[in-house]
Amino acid sequence: MAQHDFAPAWLNFPTPPSSTKSSLNFEKHSENFAWTENRYDVNRRRHNSSDGFDSAIGRPNGGNFGRKEKNGWRTHGRNGTENINHRGGYHGGSSRSRSSIFHAGKSQGLHENNIPDNETGRKEDKRERKQFEAEDFPSLNPEYEREPNHNKSLAAGVWEYPPNPKSRAPRMLVIKKGNTKDLQLSGFPVVGNLPSQPVKNGTGPSVYKGLVPKPAAPPTKPTQWKSQTKENKVGTSFPHESTFGVGNFNAFKSTAKNFSPSTNSVKECNRSNSSSPVDKLNQQPRLTKLTRMRTDKKSEFLKALKRDRVEEEHEDESRAGSEKDDDSFNLHNSNSTHQERDINRNFDENEIPQENGNASVISQQIIRSSTFPQTDVLSSSLEAEHRLLKEMGWQEDSENDETCAPLTEDEMREFQVISEQLQKNGLRKNGILKNGLICDFKFGPWKNSTFKPTTENDDTETSSSDTSDDDDV
């Protein structure tokens, strides 16, 4: 026989006709069986987790309990003693088959009370189904807000009792009122308006109008709004508290405990992690406003970045002029002779075409680095490296002019192989090659192309002076 799989109540979805059909079905067939030996007790305990699982399994008066109509099973028990416990109300997917089976059992047990018991069963069935729909789908029947929610307790979790939309309305209205008028007076006059607010907006579909704040609220006190968002950036990440400063919200909390409609809502403000999806949907317009306010600094930063990039493009056009300026700037810093500079420039020109189409990337690097004293585009790590190279490489350059001898062909080939390997691995993008290829070309214009071989020699000097750059990378 089909035993019950103890499915939780929230898995079953309500289909109204099936439960009434099943209860009528029981009423019709209850007259076929003799119920004289043992009658059901009217106040029989209901089983919560096993919906429709009645206590007649081991008893002699089970009867044809829950005949499945669609499959056409007619199983008349022996003298009404065999319990064939099919899931009577489940064949239509009824969510509240528990109540229909239960009341049909009562009506079979007490035959003279057949009709009133079934009617009460249907009423209870409707009420429970309505409550279930309203708690889980408040947008389907907004008139549910008129009924009081009896089984609401703060101790239970959100799974047992989903958040009730009625208790949500005063909370959101507190937020709306607090934004407009008296928030600077630490919130005390505002709470006095609470009991009158649900009367205006608490019933019918107008609750959703109350949940959405008016667009006129932020412009009335713009300075207050901005200061509160700044204050919230430091401390709070809760969406409910985001329109208030923390201090003002605590004042609300302390005074709101005097009013019965607002106690649940104020306490639930701190339980924003367990709020239902409906709650989050209702808060979206307010949150989008706040995020717009909060991303002001970010948008300003992005605008500045775009401006810098546009400037860089302009400097790209005037690249020749800027390089000349850099050359004249570097003439003061370097004491090397014109001959060495010419030789190194020749090597530079030989080396750039050998980079296999990297010339465009390198030119961008040169431009960005050449504008370094003017614009703060480089990151902090590159700045630090720039400073370090200034301290190490550039000062040594004037002293160690004899090390600036032209590179041999072996060194050139070695450098090219290493740079190609690194290019293939894509390490340039990750910034690992900071003291390698990028730096060689980055500081080329400053030194009028004399710095490149010196960095090569410096790198080889630091790595035991005979080995290649493989040790550094």
UniProtKB/Swiss-Prot annotation:
Biased composition (Basic and acidic residues): 119-133, 293-329
Cellular compartment(s): Nucleus; Cytoplasm
Gene Ontology cellular-component terms listed: cytosol; intracellular membrane-bounded organelle; nucleus; plasma membrane
Disulfide bridge partners, by residue number: none
Region entry Disordered, spans: 1-25, 46-149, 191-342, 444-473
Tissue note: Widely expressed. Some isoforms may be specifically expressed in veins and arteries (at protein level). Isoform 4 is widely expressed. Isoform 1, isoform 2 and isoform 3 may be specifically expressed in vascular smooth muscle cells.
Modification type Phosphoserine: residues: 49, 274, 276, 322, 381
GO biological process, one term: DNA-templated transcription
Residue intervals passing through the bilayer: none
Biased composition (Acidic residues): 456-473
InterPro entries, A to Z: Vasculin_fam
Domain of life: Eukaryota
Keywords from the UniProt entry: Activator, Cytoplasm, DNA-binding, Methylation, Nucleus, Phosphoprotein, Transcription, Transcription regulation
One MF annotation (Gene Ontology) recorded for this entry: RNA binding
Binding partners and assembly: Interacts with GTF2B, GTF2F2, RNA polymerase II and TBP.
Official protein name in the record: Vasculin
Source organism of the structure: Homo sapiens
